[in-house]
């Protein structure tokens, strides 16, 4: 399964790991399908580290899962933050996943075992490059808005 994140800076296509982390994948895909993420901003951007979004309030303090509460981590030894473009659930501690997610800009091995990886970027790395270069202000908030306009879900990861 794959999705395309249609941002105001361009499109990013991600493979979603439905078999490896079924609960996280179900949550993300259902939120995408419902339009939950449409029009949300990426509220935190740290060059060389990651970009974070998925909070409908745009503050980094909001968002919930499809179950209306936090859900447990799905940490897998086979999934590592070992490359640019890893897609993970953001959390405020163990088993506190909701709707927020982040995409890594580089390897981040110190995150392994702490955040559920549920996908990876497969196309649109040039858009990640643009995002990473966006200037930020207090709280690592982008000075120029980076918006997730909408999400397209693809049943076949190789589909256009």
UniProtKB/Swiss-Prot annotation:
It comes from the Eukaryota. One of its GO terms (biological process) is protein folding. GO terms for cellular component: cytoplasm. CDD domains: Cyclophilin_PPIL3_like. The keyword tRNA-binding does not apply. Its EC number is 5.2.1.8. Pfam families: Pro_isomerase. Its main location: cytoplasm. Keywords: Chaperone, Cytoplasm, Isomerase, Rotamase. Residues 3-153 form the PPIase cyclophilin-type domain. It catalyses: [protein]-peptidylproline (omega=180) = [protein]-peptidylproline (omega=0). PPIases accelerate the folding of proteins. It catalyzes the cis-trans isomerization of proline imidic peptide bonds in oligopeptides. PANTHER family: PEPTIDYL-PROLYL CIS-TRANS ISOMERASE-LIKE 3, PEPTIDYL-PROLYL CIS-TRANS ISOMERASE-RELATED. Belongs to the cyclophilin-type PPIase family. This is Peptidyl-prolyl cis-trans isomerase CYP18-1. It comes from Arabidopsis thaliana (Mouse-ear cress).
